[in-house]
From Swiss-Prot:
In-chain residues carrying the UniProt-annotated modification Phosphoserine: 462, 464, 469
Location of region: Leucine-zipper: 370-391
Species lineage: Eukaryota, Metazoa, Chordata, Craniata, Vertebrata
Phosphothreonine carried by residues: 399
Biased composition regions of type Low complexity, renumbered to the chain: 462-472
Protein name, as recorded: Apoptosis inhibitor 5
The species this protein was found in: Pongo abelii (Sumatran orangutan)
Region (Disordered): 452-504
A single BP term in Gene Ontology: apoptotic process
Localization per Swiss-Prot or TrEMBL: Nucleus; Cytoplasm
Motif placement: Nuclear localization signal: 454-475
Any GO molecular function: RNA binding
Keywords linked to the UniProt accession: Acetylation, Apoptosis, Cytoplasm, Nucleus, Phosphoprotein, Repeat
Length: 504
């Protein structure tokens, strides 16, 4: 093993040789042997090996292996020095191997070391993006779980920081191709991260790019399979996939496949859905997703059949007044509960799809069925008016901080929900029923559109989902509020707001 003095002497030989460096193979070999020495020798070797690496292609394997030994040394300062110099080895055919090594080194728990690995990966990314991706995806597909997890997170956080000259169209195509391989077997969280990666790619922000992403999500959602409402994994997969698809839909990228699947497979099983996460109102969650998608549904093969399924489900949440109930169960003083949150979603979805078959209520339903529906609408509208008056009175004069209390936030959302339902019911009371009104769903931010300005939706929307979806159902950007459905205003004649919030 060479001493510190011998290392310096051989370094001098190589440094003085200028253009004839490659003739001093023995001197470079001495430096390579420095990795077998003590702390001082290793530290010098970590600096000297990369400095002259390019002059000795025949010793490339030995040099990379020597540096790799130093990257795994027990001394953290030696590891850091060795990692810092790794990009100097990333030349030609060696680059994918260096990328592979750096990807494996992402598993370190030392924060300074981890940052060095990230910086080194970014450095070689700028030298050869395709080669670096080869190393990263190799570990994602075949590496240990911790390496796979961190490599995916590296891509999801760092790709967007790279300039366009690095992320060329060819590079983005490679990312898409390799991602498709990974998506054949991913966890829920990994799927969300890959959708974030892919939807952020410039080449996939066109109409055709968005369509490709929707098809990827549809494949992941397994829309060809029969839905199993009692399997929490099946339910969770559908929810996660649909959440990723929703921000991709636009007037040019249709949600038809998803809406059809929800109408045919999910709505009939709404009451038997198994929630994948404790505390989640799974039925309301499904109905909200359906409502959001319904705006972008294209031509549907079985429109009348699916509209009828949606209509029948809506009727379940729009009760007859007590005196009109056929079985008498609701007779007497007890008023049926009005589940405003559910009705907003179902009525909105029906209103959106109804536009495609405007004579559904008048030509497709028999007179008795239509009369029954009008009675239910009228009863619900009456309850709405009572509730809206109560809410407006409760919020009257409140501004700024006063509106930020938890109680008032609930009232504000409740007012949005009831106003939306009110507008939609008025449309359906028209003769013939109208489908012209536009409302913003209560949990969605109101979009202000300047006159003459295009809505910033369609093909330029940011690819990353507006929700920070984790493996579970939590979502950030939506600021989703689950009102205590079924607990809002029960007794129309004797309204008690505070009691309606019990159980929240």
């Amino acid at each position: 093993m060479p001493t510190v003095e011998e290392l310096y002497r051989n370094y001098g030989i190589l440094a003085d040789a200028t253009e004839q460096v490659g003739q001093h193979k023995d001197a470079y070999q001495v430096i390579l042997d420095g990795v077998k020495g003590g702390t001082k020798e290793k530290r010098l070797a970590a600096q000297f090996i990369p400095k002259f690496f390019k002059h000795f292609p025949e010793l490339a394997d030995s040099a990379i292996n020597a540096q790799l030994d130093l990257c795994e040394d027990e001394d953290v300062s030696i590891r850091r020095q060795a990692i810092k110099e790794l990009p100097q080895f990333a030349t030609g055919e060696n680059l994918p191997r260096v990328a592979d090594i750096l990807t494996q080194l992402l598993q370190t728990d030392d924060s300074a070391e981890f940052n060095l690995v990230n910086n080194a990966l970014l450095s070689i990314f700028k030298m050869d993006a395709k080669g670096t991706l080869g190393g990263l995806f190799s570990q994602i597909l075949q590496g240990e779980d911790i390496v796979r997890e961190r490599a995916i997170k590296f891509l999801s956080t760092k790709l967007k920081t790279l300039p366009d000259e690095v992320l060329t169209k060819e590079v983005e195509e490679l990312i898409l191709t390799e991602s498709k391989k990974v998506l054949e077997d991913v966890t829920g969280e990994e799927f969300v991260l890959f959708m974030k990666i892919l939807s952020g790619l410039k080449s996939l922000q066109t109409v055709s790019g968005r369509q490709q992403l929707v098809e990827l999500v549809a494949e992941q959602a397994d829309l060809e399979q029969t839905f199993n409402p009692s399997d929490p994994d099946c339910v969770d997969r559908l929810l996660q996939c649909t959440r990723q698809a929703v921000p991709l839909f636009s007037k040019n990228v249709h949600s038809t496949r998803f809406v059809t699947y929800f109408c045919e497979q999910v709505l009939p099983n709404l009451g038997t859905l198994t929630t994948p996460v404790e505390g989640l109102d799974i039925q309301l969650e499904v109905l909200k997703l359906l409502a959001e998608m319904s705006s972008f549904c294209g031509d549907m093969e079985k429109l009348e059949t699916n509209l009828r399924k949606l209509f029948d489900k809506l009727l379940e949440y729009m009760p007859l007044p007590p005196e009109e109930a056929e079985n008498g169960e609701n007779a007497g003083n007890e008023e049926p509960k009005l589940q405003f949150s559910y009705v907003e979603c179902l009525l909105y979805s029906f209103h959106q799809l109804g536009r495609k078959l405007p004579d559904f209520l008048t030509a497709k339903l028999n007179a008795e069925k239509l009369k029954d529906f009008k009675i239910r609408l009228q009863y619900f509208a009456r309850g709405l008016q009572v509730y809206i008056r109560q809410l407006r009175l409760a919020l009257q004069g409140k501004t700024g901080e006063a509106l930020k209390t938890e109680e008032n936030k609930i009232k504000v959302v409740a007012l949005k929900i009831t106003n939306n339902i009110n507008v939609l019911i008025k449309d359906l009371f028209h003769i013939p029923p109208s489908y012209k009104s536009t409302v913003t769903l209560s949990w969605k931010p109101v979009q202000k559109v300047e006159i003459g300005q295009k809505r910033a939706s369609e093909d330029t929307t940011s690819g990353s989902p507006p929700k920070k979806s984790s493996a579970g159902p939590k979502r950030d950007a939506r600021q989703i509020y689950n009102p205590p459905s079924g607990k809002y205003s029960s007794n129309l004649g004797n309204f008690n707001y505070e009691r309606s919030l019990q159980g929240k």
